[in-house]
Swiss-Prot record:
Intracellular or extracellular location(s): Cytoplasm
Family stated for the protein in its record: Belongs to the SmpB family.
Predominant location category: cytoplasm
Keyword annotations of the record: Cytoplasm, RNA-binding
GO CC terms of this entry: cytosol
Biased composition annotated in UniProt, kind: Basic and acidic residues: 132-157
InterPro entries referenced in this protein's UniProt entry, alphabetically: SmpB, SsrA-bd_prot, SsrA-bd_prot_CS
Spans annotated as Disordered: 126-157
Example GO BP: trans-translation
Job of this protein: Required for rescue of stalled ribosomes mediated by trans-translation. Binds to transfer-messenger RNA (tmRNA), required for stable association of tmRNA with ribosomes. tmRNA and SmpB together mimic tRNA shape, replacing the anticodon stem-loop with SmpB. tmRNA is encoded by the ssrA gene; the 2 termini fold to resemble tRNA(Ala) and it encodes a 'tag peptide', a short internal open reading frame. During trans-translation Ala-aminoacylated tmRNA acts like a tRNA, entering the A-site of stalled ribosomes, displacing the stalled mRNA.
UniProt entry tagged with the keyword Nuclease: no
Protein name: SsrA-binding protein
GO molecular function: RNA binding
Length: 157
């Protein structure tokens, strides 16, 4: 029997700064409730989640401040570009994330927006704790040292 192909993920938006500003301790995948024009705009590859975060709104978890531009072909039926979007998670997952943000000083940040192999828009969420300035500098030093070490090993070998 042939091995299963790895699921394809077409990444639309990537929040690379989140791993710099936060120590990500847990990640999970969530669906996102979108309108038709938002899906069309995402399929065009345009979205920004650099300033986005997830937080509670009533009993749901919402994605705030994520920018999905208007779809150019839809004239008067377009969506609001920075509206709060509902995240589709199980109740137990929502309660866990809300509890962590309220008690322990954690933040839920979106790491990626992508389309899965079934064509559904998904958000990869990270539960992270903010880094101090000295932690960020330490991470940069460690990354530079790893790069230099790899370069030295490559030149010797």
């Amino acid at each position: 029997m042939a091995p299963k192909p790895e699921p394809s993920r077409r990444i639309v938006a990537d929040n690379r700064a989140a791993r710099y500003h936060y120590t990500i301790e847990d990640t999970l995948e969530a669906g996102i409730a979108l309108t038709g024009t938002e899906v069309k705009s995402l399929r065009g590859g345009k979205a920004t989640i650099g300033e986005a975060y997830a937080g509670p709104s009533g009993t749901d978890l919402m994605l705030f401040n994520a920018y999905i531009p208007e779809y150019l072909e839809a004239n008067r039926f377009n969506h609001d570009t920075k509206r709060p979007r509902r995240l589709l998670l199980h109740r137990r997952q929502i309660n866990k994330l809300i509890g962590a943000t309220q008690r322990q000083g954690y933040t839920v940040v979106p790491l990626k927006i992508y389309f899965n192999d079934k064509g559904r828009a998904k958000v990869e969420l990270g539960l992270g704790k903010g880094k101090q300035a000295h932690d960020k500098r330490e991470a940069v030093k460690e990354r530079d040292w790893q790069r230099d070490r790899a370069r030295l090993m490559r030149d010797r070998g």
